[in-house]
Amino acid sequence: WTADIGAFFVKRGDYWYWDGEYDDTVEDPAYLELYTRWYQWCCFLPIFRGHGTDCRRELWNFKGADGVFYQAMLRANKLRYELLPYIYSTAGKVWLYDASMIRMLAFDFPKDAKALEITDQYLFGESLMVCPVTETMYYKKSATGAEKQENPSKVRNVYLPEGCGWYDFWTNTYYEGGQWIEAEAPIERIPLFVKEGSILPMQQSANSTAETVMSGNLTFVVYAQKDCSYELYTDDGDGYAYENGAYTLETYMWNQSEQILRDSKGREVVFVYGKASK
């Protein structure tokens, strides 16, 4: 299954299992921070939905505290739509190849002893490494309410597995693998890294899932310093015709020496760089 953003039983209730800590729900800054971090994390799960009990979970109910939490969740929501071509293609490969959407680092980096021990980072599809923020930074929950933290730490430690380089999704900064770094983690975002050698299909943020990869208006972001390729799965986005072969697989190939992206017919494809800066 998947996470239910918002959680169940967030308030104190009448039964032994109904023992939440956030009676004021969206009026409690500590709950706003918690919900925001959950929302940012769940952006990188197969199913993304605000579900739970005891309080409203629609984004427009989180505009308090100067709107910083609302803006952070809105940013995550837009990113989810921007990544739909990648997410949809990944889901297609789960059906077609028995691939997995989410994997622990040990699956892809079995020879990296440090990666075997990581339990708070994971791979989402073949290209993205997600690093959720699981510690409070801005508000600490106490018996008297939410205590605002002075000079909060806005970083978290991230391990970059060895065997490839990594790009910071937000800044395009390039890092060699096999090292720990302090990654920026302000309330606006969680650390997110792209594996070197990736071609990431994206689109403009949409109003609904009806405006997805089938629109054909894709942007390919190249994160590479050598030749690489990406196989994009598409179908009509509705019904079960794909089970009878009504789908398309298109391979996009990056030529590092020519700095050109081509499709499987040799046609040049418009792309943008996930530029490296050391």
Label each residue range with its predicted role.
Residues 1-189, 237-242:
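Catalytic-domain carbohydrate-binding cleft regions of carbohydrate-active enzymes
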Residues 189-278:
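Accessory, solvent-exposed terminal regions and/or long lumenal/extracellular loops of proteins
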